[in-house]
Regions:
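Beta-propeller-forming repeat regions
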Residues: 1-457
Length: 457
């Protein structure tokens, strides 16, 4: 893809009915620049473009997929900067609806900011169709350390029309950058939501609230789970049972370099891990990395303090007790999230991560490269999965699964094509790697926010 870049992570579904999964991505140019290929669909068979859709700013989000027009093909709902939110017919790329940036709410004019990844929730307006839960926030025009920022909003949007059903400001009145995750409550039909506030330089909190409160337009009684005075909670959390009571618990990254676990029933802390001299802006990989049956966690944090973040540091944390079982420091800063699968049939998952590095030639010129690697926690070995390729990958999480139904692992990964710059929007490459690795069990965490794209393990 020439002249554009991507912060989006690939989603896969069959759009053209050939039985092979196709690839959906967001892309764009520099901030505030329009792009005619801001949303693209690529043929999974050969990489050719199936369709492209324009946007007024970067589409950095990762799509949610749902057949909203009842034609048997999943449609694409995807988000980006400057209040970009679109629903697109997956079959042909026709825009079903766009969020109207002039939308008033309760007869008041509003300023809309970035949308973050959408989630589907049960029907909220009695039209017989699921609706969209989504956050909007983050005023990029505010100076980095200015605490006076517009409050973010948690919204329910009609998936059929893009119209607002309800809107609730953040419970602490702060901004938000988090893609929320919702999970059915353990003792009712209610859906619980994890949301976060704050940013790179502004403290914030992690909250639990419910869809019914969002529908009322008031989440001021949200349950505070954790707070940081220095950094916010920006990375998507996960719902996963680590207490073996069949109730999903909550695991989340804090921007100040902590990994936190909370009981899904009583919401009390289970364990907390602090990674010194790091900050967390990526999400969490979930897998069975140790010998027991309790899911474990692999994270890649940024070393340093924003904006002076250059290197990455990786940790594997035992889900049973919060013990750090593995640590490494590999590569330059990247904000991608690892994915997980059993690559060698030893009944333990390996974590797959895109790693950035540089080389310096004889005239001290830097060249930037990336490589896909797997961490084998049973042998503590690092396994390269690809050759090194020119360019860096800052935020695009790989997708792993079976794209063509042959029961062998396929890997989709992206990176920029600029050999001499790390942050660039002048070209990126999408790769499909076909392996001979058999898939012996369902892959639960094979994409950003998991294989179902919803943050639920």
């Amino acid at each position: 893809m020439q002249g554009v870049g991507s912060f989006s992570s690939p989603r896969v579904t069959d759009l053209n009915g050939d039985g092979i999964g196709d690839i959906i991505l967001g892309s764009g140019r520099q901030e505030f620049q329009a792009c005619d290929s801001a949303i693209i669909a690529l043929n999974g068979l050969n990489g050719e473009m199936l369709w492209n859709v324009s946007a007024q700013d970067q589409i950095f989000g990762s799509a949610s997929l749902k057949d909203i027009n009842n034609d048997g093909i999943k449609d694409v709902i995807i988000n980006g900067r400057s209040a970009e939110l679109q629903a697109i017919d997956g079959r042909n790329g026709t825009v079903i609806w766009k969020f109207d940036k002039k939308t008033r709410y309760q007869n008041k004019a509003r300023k809309w900011f970035n949308f973050y990844n959408p989630q589907f929730i049960p029907d909220q307006n009695d039209d017989g169709h699921e609706d969209i839960l989504i956050t909007n926030g983050g005023d990029v025009m505010v100076e980095a350390f200015d605490p006076n920022r517009p409050a973010g909003n948690l919204m329910i949007i009609d998936a059929q029309s893009g119209k607002i059903i309800s809107l609730a400001p953040m419970p602490d009145g702060k901004e938000t950058y988090m893609s929320v995750s919702a999970c059915k409550n353990f003792d009712s039909d209610e859906y619980a939501i994890i949301l976060g506030t704050g940013g790179e330089t502004i403290g914030g909190s992690l909250f639990l609230t419910y869809v019914s409160d969002v529908l009322k337009g008031d989440i001021s009684n949200a349950i505070p789970l954790a707070t940081s005075q220095t950094n916010g909670f920006t990375a998507p959390p996960v719902w996963v049972d680590v207490t073996e009571d069949s109730i999903p618990d909550i695991v989340a990254n804090a921007g100040d370099g902590r990994l936190l676990a909370f009981n899904g029933k009583g919401h009390e802390p289970i364990w907390a891990v602090t990674m010194k001299d790091t900050e967390a802006y990526s999400s969490i990989s979930v897998g069975h990395f140790t010998e027991d049956n309790i899911p474990d966690f692999f994270v890649s944090y940024a070393q340093g303090s924003w904006p002076n973040l250059e290197w990455a540091k990786q940790f594997m944390v035992n889900g049973k007790n919060g013990k750090i079982e593995f640590t490494d420091s590999l590569g330059y800063l990247q904000l991608t999230t690892p994915v997980a699968a059993d690559l060698n049939s030893d009944y333990r998952d390996e974590a797959i991560l895109n790693m950035n590095f540089q080389q310096i030639d004889s005239i001290y010129r830097k060249s930037f490269y990336n490589i896909l690697v797997a961490f084998d926690f049973k042998t503590n070995k690092l396994i390269p999965l690809t050759e090194s390729l020119p360019g860096h990958n800052i935020t695009t999480t790989p997708w792993i699964g079976d794209i063509d139904g042959d029961n062998l692992l396929d890997i989709i990964y992206c990176h920029s094509t600029s050999e001499f710059q790390t942050y660039t929007f002048d070209g990126f490459q999408v790769n499909l790697l076909k392996t001979d690795i058999p898939i012996r069990k369902p892959i639960k965490w094979g994409a950003y926010m998991g294989s179902n794209y919803d943050g639920v393990y």
